[in-house]
Amino acid sequence: MKLTADRYAGASSSLTLDTDALSRYTDLVDLSIGDTDFVTDSRIIEAAARDARAGYTHYGFPQGDPQLIDAIRSSWKEDYNVDISRDEIFISASSCLGMSQLMTAVLNPGDEVIVLAPYFALYRQQIEMAGGVCVEVASYEEEAYALNAERLEKAITPKTRAIILNNPCNPTGAAYTRRDLELLAETARKHDLMLIGDEIYTRYVFEGEFIPMLTLPGIRDRLVTLNSFSKNFMMTGWRVGCIICPPELRKVIQWVNGAQIYTAPSISQRAAIEALAIRRDIEKLYVSRYRERMVYASDRIEKIPYMTIARPRGTFYLFPSIKKTGLSSKAFCAEAVNQAHVLMSPGCAFGACGEGYVRIAATQPMEKLAAAFDRLEQMKF
């Protein structure tokens, strides 16, 4: 008996890591995982526990906790002077699930979605599971991963449905300028395309400022913004995010969600309310530490003879080239585990133009980062 559908023939993870490395090397430094090393702030945990005892342990509202929806609206107004109606917000059980539900809601079979590569490793899977086609538009280290209008235009066909922009970008650390975003908006209007802003690391812009796509004029009718509490608030395990989009699309996403999990976890939504209330403190206490790590890691990479890097402007990821070694991304990562006891993600997992690169997550304390780079400097090829 065949157990799986034909469409999943040959399905495998794009991000293949040496998960046995930790058992082989007790001194392994794991720089592969995009999970913060800080525990969720105690005030958030305590608020969630208090609300759990008060009875927030049942199904919630399908659209999301009304108090959380209003807290999101207030934060957008205070932080970016953007007005958002309640009908435009849907609370998702993570932005990752939200993106999958969005693809299901907007794609017809064969629709093409442009992703700016290197891109978040799950985009292709999310698009293809919804019957779409993932189209990569490359960006390059030599251009500081800036948006290239000519390559973008060439990728657009009559089947193009949407463009996804991850800002700031996992894995490259690129943070896009207002001019980049205006160019993207102009292209979307010209070709009548949907714009999807995957804005997960909004607090992690270390050069310049984070510019939400919602601040651009004249694109609200074609714009979808995904936000998450995972990285900004050290809440990866709580699984809560939100989608901001036109009301008619929000209703369809909510319908899709109803057939899957019905509603995001009530207790996680209560935690998210507290997170927004103390967001200034969170930024001061935690995000500033990542800025220090990113500067340190960039400096160390620039001193390693076989690596080059376009210094990241945001996120907590670095994406150095290892082309000088002559190894593929996967082969280099295997050598790094065996020689240096350092685990990283191969760049090929993030699109074709990621081959020859590795992703480093600065999600370890400074002393472990230092140890990792000390060992990487000693590698022989």
Locations of regions flagged by a protein language model:
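PLP-dependent class I/II
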Residues: 2-10, 21-25, 29, 35-51, ...
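Conserved N-terminal alpha-helix of the aminotransferase class I/II PLP-enzyme fold
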Residues: 59-92
